[in-house]
Amino acid sequence: HALHDEFLKLNHFKKILNHKQMVLNKEIKPSKFCFISKALHEDSKELYSFFRKYFDPYLFYFSQKNLEEKIPNILVYKENQKIRAALIYTQTLNANFLDFIAVDRNLKHKNVAFALLNHYFAANTQNKFFKLFVEEKNQKAINFYKRAGFCFNHINLKFYRNF
């Protein structure tokens, strides 16, 4: 650990964020909501702009082209044909990772974030392991995930910058 800290100091790295992993620790009975749908290829430009509003460009690691390839793993909520909430996930052989979720304020439906999360669970019933990373200071997100049945494990993802 001391060697790691020395390397960071010598190379002028500063810790900018610490994300902690959370895993779903309960059986779920997901429900689908009629106002949530899968993203379409023609949504990709709008999705890219939508997520860039909410996430630092250093953290939102999808290019517009990458996002187009992720379309089958993106869920959206639209009002007046505009994307107002979305969730991106990744499937692996034994787990599902929630990559990003963002929800506009003042929506017609008040439970859109919960509905997106439930749709994500329902779309991935073949896989029982659900994981995500959350910024350790984002108490609103942490509380939301805890209410959904997620809990912290011991894995941290630290972000550093030297510029």
Predicted features along the sequence, with ranges:
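Conserved beta-strand-loop-alpha-helix junction that forms the acyl-donor binding cleft
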Residues: 1-5, 131-142, 158-163
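Acyl-donor-binding surface of acyltransferase catalytic domains
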Residues: 1-33, 156-161
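A structural microfeature
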Residues: 17-18, 84-85, 113, 154
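Short amphipathic alpha-helix that is part of the acyltransferase structural core
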Residues: 19, 29-58
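Hydrophobic adenine-recognition pocket in adenosine-nucleotide-binding enzymes
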Residues: 39, 101-103, 134
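A conserved beta-strand-loop-helix scaffold within acyl/acetyltransferase catalytic domains
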Residues: 59-102
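Conserved acetyl-CoA-binding loop-helix of GNAT-fold acetyltransferases
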Residues: 103, 109-122, 142-147
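Short, high-confidence coil segments that cap the C-terminus of an alpha-helix
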Residues: 127-129
